[in-house]
Amino acid sequence: MKVAFFSETGNNQRYPRDFPNARTECAWAIALDAPMCALDVLPREKFDLGIVIIPKNNPKVNLDFIRKCCDKVAIMQEGPHWYFQDYDIDKQFHYYNTLRSADWVYCHNESDVKYYRGLGCEDVRVMRSLMIPEDILPRSEWGDATIIGGNFVSWYGGFDSYIVARETDATIYAPSMGRKQKQEDAIEDIQYLPYMTWREWINNLSQYNIGVHLMRTHAAGTFAMNCAFHSIPCIGYRGLDTQENCHPNLTVDVGDLETAVRKAQLLKEDMGYYDECSLQAQKGFSEYYTEYKWLENWNKQFTL
């Protein structure tokens, strides 16, 4: 099957396997040898399937335009499934009608499937998250620091993660994301990383001992997956496939900070528990998120 992706960052070209910013959508394209195409400039090639990633800030995509070069057109979820409800009213209905007009919808998590079916989308499929760790080695030496997965805004739940991370009695690190607040640099017990490319981030992640990402905004769940690649135990909220598949012992209900705190204390105090969670992460990544397993799962949807 010949596939193309369409997004606001597309330029009708294919990514190399060592692309420095190979985030999930790029990894999908790499695995399928698919170009990432523009939404407003058609490629010269024809495709069996076009997968459209609707931009968060400009949802008025015309699927009929994409159908000129694609036999089938699917929509790929971008962000949490409720994100479109912050649009202006006309854009909310345009987004809804666009979903309904697609041949099928791809979503991030099993927990998203029923939502899209409830909207009236009859064919809803899960597109697993993916990373292409080309020439990147999993960690071989264990550090003693803790990394949290986002900044101090409701989108990332950084405050929740910070409260839990303190229980590990280790130096706390955090990435610098686009929603980072200026005053965060004044938090004395967090070391902030500079902005990085995806490859720099994955290499840097290898030095940490514990991950905490209590993010209520459920989408691709790449932090939990990235930690699992390095066999790093990660505490996170239920609802993300990557979290539940790779870190089952460390998955807590949304808002259950009490249990999350206990999990962090256990990881610090009980080496046997830590090792068990680390092995679960390694096993979960191998079973669900290698490129081989991703392609195997991708091919199943067309052979059922």
For the regions a language model picked out, list residue spans one by one.
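Donor nucleotide-sugar binding/catalytic pocket of nucleotide-sugar-dependent glycosyltransferases
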Residues: 103-115, 121-136
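Conserved acidic donor-binding segment of nucleotide-sugar-dependent glycosyltransferases
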Residues: 248-257, 266-271
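Acidic donor-binding loop of glycosyltransferase active sites
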Residues: 206-219, 232
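N-terminal pre-catalytic "stem/leader" segment of glycosyltransferase-like enzymes
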Residues: 1-65, 115, 249-253, 296, ...
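A charged, aromatic-enriched C-terminal amphipathic alpha-helix characteristic of glycosyltransferases
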Residues: 20, 269-303
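Conserved catalytic-core segment of nucleotide-activated headgroup transferases in glycan assembly
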Residues: 16-21, 133-135, 139-186, 192-198
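Short alpha-helical segment that forms part of, or immediately flanks, the ligand-binding pocket
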Residues: 202, 224-230, 243
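Membrane-proximal helix-turn-helix segments that form the acceptor-binding/catalytic region
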Residues: 87-105
